[in-house]
Amino acid sequence: LISDDLDVIARAIAAVDEAIAASVPGVVGIHIEGPFLNPAKHGIHDPAKFLALDDSAVDLLSSLRNGKTLVTLAPEVAAPGVIASLVARGVIVSAGHSLASFEDMESAAGEGLSGVTHLFNAMTQLGSREPGLVGAAIDLGLISGLIVDRHHVHAAALRAAYRAKGADELMLVTDAMPSV
């Protein structure tokens, strides 16, 4: 589910809860990508849907009764303690659509952020003096999603990520989305 109004997110969470309760094969949880993202890295997301991550949003994001919830957010737009609150409620938190610095990522990982959504895309890149989000993903051992269609990420970057992180820290991402 990409960035949308909170009522749409609430309905999606309820639908996933019902599907898991009904033992629908293959449904194990929900990935909510946004709307707590950096507008400068919006990608396909509509920045008009972006919101502040407040207590009511934390309550909603942690409301799935069955299965797992994965939330992608931009760590630099989350107030201190918000990531820790989500993690304490069982939510898996991943960074994406972000201008986070390496230091932002260290703080977020310290609060329990454990992943990176679509490594290399819509995030700060690895530089010699500013490792950025990509550098943090590598250095901090964060599980990283990777779109391997050779359109989103160059084949050489895919190989470099695999060599740097290994199979245990990478997951394949389809980036499936409705036609736009």
Where are the regions that the model predicts?
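Short, well-ordered beta-to-alpha junction loops that form the rim of enzyme active sites
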Residues: 2, 35, 176
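Active-site-adjacent C-terminal substructures of enzyme catalytic domains
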Residues: 104-180
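Histidine/acidic-residue-rich, glycine-tolerant segments that coordinate divalent metal ions
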Residues: 5-131
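Conserved strand-turn element in the central/C-terminal portion of the radical SAM core barrel
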Residues: 1-6, 147-149
